[in-house]
Amino acid sequence: MTTVIQRRSTSNVWEQFCEWVTSTDNRLYIGWFGVLMIPTLLTATTCFIIAFIGAPPVDIDGIREPVSGSLLYGNNIISGAVVPSSAAIGLHFYPIWEAASLDEWLYNGGPYQLIVLHFLIGVFCYMGREWELSYRLGMRPWIAVAYSAPVAAATAVFLIYPIGQGSFSDGMPLGISGTFNFMLVFQAEHNILMHPFHQLGVAGVFGGALFSAMHGSLVTSSLIRETSEEESQNLGYKFGQEEETYNIVAAHGYFGRLIFQYASFNNSRSLHFFLAAWPVIGIWFTALGISIMAFNLNGFNFNQSIVDSNGRVVGTWADVLNRANLGMEVMHERNAHNFPLDLAAVEVAPAVRG
């Protein structure tokens, strides 16, 4: 008879839990950031789905005129949204237990705060989890750094902007048409299109899309032939193979002749760093711009029209933008005030006749 003697495990439940959380052998890495990320994102997602489907109207402007955003109250997928918290709540922290009843909490838009704050904690932890997994695997930390761009953008529109404006009611609604409404109102009140940081963000996003398409098409066009005409070219690559799957010299030569020599990268590492850095830096600047405009340091304005020697207005594109901004501002919160602030606070300026 054979007797097998095993050493009894001396680790307790907590040590086993710690080992499981930080193990890179799991199908999905949990990590310490994941311990907080998972419940917060599940909470935000669950509340969003319920609110998008059935939340009652919210008194967003604090003037007893509720706005419906859910599907069961007459909206569709395009027009539906989770409406931001009421202006009557302002920046006050408004959990369920701060309201006198659940009906009051829903009427004042409590679900918006619950969703946004849990969502932000969740995406912060997701970024930390990216860094944590990179650290465990001995990788460099740039994946988390790149992800910081959309995290900064989300933080700017959901947290920094409401803080600067003094109320969560100014945050971005959680829906398709609500997002576009937020963009139009932001342009009307802050002239974001004329802010240099937003312009850098546009260059980052559009430039990143252009560079991604250029890189992908160049690589695909210079693949090393490994298959016949009857086979898919994708079969010519084996996961983990040591040799390069495309000819970077050919791609470099093509692009160098198409534009000029120094427009083409001859170093694969610097090329991919550039592809990552360009859109990330652009989105960083946009998030910074929104955070600046949150405190009303707005984009360039040209409110003083150009006039000739007889006092007649010489129409410019700036006048067109100004009138468009005023029109959008008049439509915004039309029952909360009679005039946009810049119409009510200054003397009537000459307008372009069109």
UniProtKB/Swiss-Prot annotation:
A quinone binds at residues 215, 264-265. Its EC number is 1.10.3.9. It is an enzyme of class 1 (oxidoreductase). It is a multi-pass membrane protein. Tyr-161 forms a radical intermediate that is referred to as redox-active TyrZ, YZ or Y-Z. It catalyses: 2 a plastoquinone + 4 hnu + 2 H2O = 2 a plastoquinol + O2. Photosystem II (PSII) is a light-driven water:plastoquinone oxidoreductase that uses light energy to abstract electrons from H(2)O, generating O(2) and a proton gradient subsequently used for ATP formation. It consists of a core antenna complex that captures photons, and an electron transfer chain that converts photonic excitation into a charge separation. The D1/D2 (PsbA/PsbD) reaction center heterodimer binds P680, the primary electron donor of PSII as well as several subsequent electron acceptors. PSII is composed of 1 copy each of membrane proteins PsbA, PsbB, PsbC, PsbD, PsbE, PsbF, PsbH, PsbI, PsbJ, PsbK, PsbL, PsbM, PsbT, PsbX, PsbY, PsbZ, Psb30/Ycf12, peripheral proteins PsbO, CyanoQ (PsbQ), PsbU, PsbV and a large number of cofactors. It forms dimeric complexes. This is Photosystem II protein D1 2. It comes from Synechococcus sp. (strain JA-2-3B'a(2-13)) (Cyanobacteria bacterium Yellowstone B-Prime).
